[in-house]
Amino acid sequence: NADKITLESMLNHTSGLGDYVGEHYHKLFKKPVGNKAILDTIKAQGVEFLPGEKTRYSNSGYYLLSRILEKVAKKPYNVLLKENITGKAGMKNTFSVLDHPTNVFKSYENNGGN
């Protein structure tokens, strides 16, 4: 079904792709991981429904969109964000984790009430 997934369907969460962050959060984010681990997880998940059939939030789609932007622009995603969004909007205190990795607050997570 990959040939049926479009940029638009990834943008509006109708691609059918799963969410690599969801149930794989603990496996992927205990330590820093590279693009290969994330791509392998997305590939292993496959699709949950045919593109256009449903709407479901997908970090996987947005991750793939960021990789596509990097390939087309030949620049890292964090640089593209700064040049095209945060810089133009004057958002001096908004940044990518790649710009300041030591200033990142750990997200909340479901740990079964513990």
Task: Tell what function each PLM region has.
Residues 2-114:
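Short, surface-exposed loop or secondary-structure junction motifs
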